[in-house]
Amino acid sequence: MNSYTGIGRRALFAAGTLLATPALAQRAARPTLLATTGMVGDLVRGVAGEGFNVETLIGEGVDPHLFRPTRSDVSRLLRADAVFYNGHRLEGRMTEVLARAAAQGDHVLAVAEALPRERLRPNEDYPDAADPHVWMDPTLWAECAPPVARVLSRLRPGQDFGPGVEATRQRLARLDAYAREVLAPIPAASRVLLTAHDAFAYFGARYEIQVESIQGLSTEAEASLANIEAMVNLIVERRIPAVFTESSVPDRAVRALIEGARARGQRVVLGGTLYSDAMGRPGTYTGTYEGMMDHNITTIARALGGNPPARGLNDRL
């Protein structure tokens, strides 16, 4: 694993030890719940309801694979009453401290690691982990809600978090139904989703779309010329109509695909920018999980030949 920048390993080790000690977290009247990513934060907020401060550590457009924690970030982790993270090495440079805390404390949860391993996809970059991008399947993401509720129940033993879990399930079931409806009309020959890195495998498996990417599950390594050439060959052979950039990943490699295909006489367009490892700007529709996924589903369907409404599921795009 790469060395930490901006904060020493000893500081992270100390943070892991302190995080694993629930007595150090001050149980305020309005507890603070700290989530690493926007997707995890949105899930926690939906289950928790009112009465909690839900904060997110990794900001808009920041790649969690490459996020470098600062001393201020560790301070926020220490002050939080509960910490929720994705797990399966999504938070690459924070993996050790978060895993240590989750193993020893009952107020730290890796939401994706709470799912049965047989439901998850393999991680070729890290054999000890699964593919971390579970939020790309709304039905799988909904299954992360009950483990969140169990952690919250330790903070508020008298509070019933069942309604939040059920509301989350219903909201994500509606999102899933929308995806199935608008993606189904995509012609078989066009059912290929080509993106910068391999964040959409769960999405592809759920909606029967072949997923191809220039990079692997992690964005830590640069795309190789060989990978780009292989993807250009695929575009030409399958006559793929569109490719997609990602909001948290540089678009150089994807634009190289477009130019490479053009040089081979195959026209391929940029189908749009998808939200993969980070949501949109806080306070906007795409700054929510539902809005992020609505945008992705609608954008993919429109570019590949589906039949989405002009402004998406909730008429807010």
Where are the regions a protein language model picked out?
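Extracytoplasmic metal-acquisition and chelation regions
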Residues: 4, 26-317
